[in-house]
Amino acid sequence: MGILKIEGVTHWSIGVNNLEESEAFYGDLLGLTPMGRLGNSVMSCFNVGDHNILLCEREQPVEIGPEADHRVHHSFTVSPETFVQACKEFDARQIPIADLIYRGQGFFTGRELYFFDPSGNRLELRDPTWSQGMPEPAFEEIVAS
């Protein structure tokens, strides 16, 4: 048990290079609920479930390439249907895909699609209903289905 008792998370922040482009990506494509911009207009709040995500426009754009630390990412839980829909939509929109992983063991099991937002932040869509022994189609096979 820690010294302090944290009662919850107010929000998570994601640094972005272009706030308007990122608002469209997270709101229109990923379907997060827009809550509005903060008073300073360089931060925009989105909600999903019990979580608030704050998009923070960087003062200077940062180039984040696929070679960046792949362990740092934000993960979103989706249904199997949304997972397939996302694969097809990302392919059609040429959203950069990093990896498709089928994780049968560990703390977070399921199938995981890693991709990048317009600012180069690594994101994950996770379908927790997939389990070891189920089919493991490649990304291209899911897109073609």
Where are these regions (language model features)?
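Vicinal oxygen chelate
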Residues: 1-5, 8-17, 47, 64-89, 92-145, ...
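Short, flexible, solvent-exposed loop/turn segments with mixed acidic/basic and small polar residues
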Residues: 2-3, 62-66
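Conserved beta-strand in the GNAT
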Residues: 54-56, 124
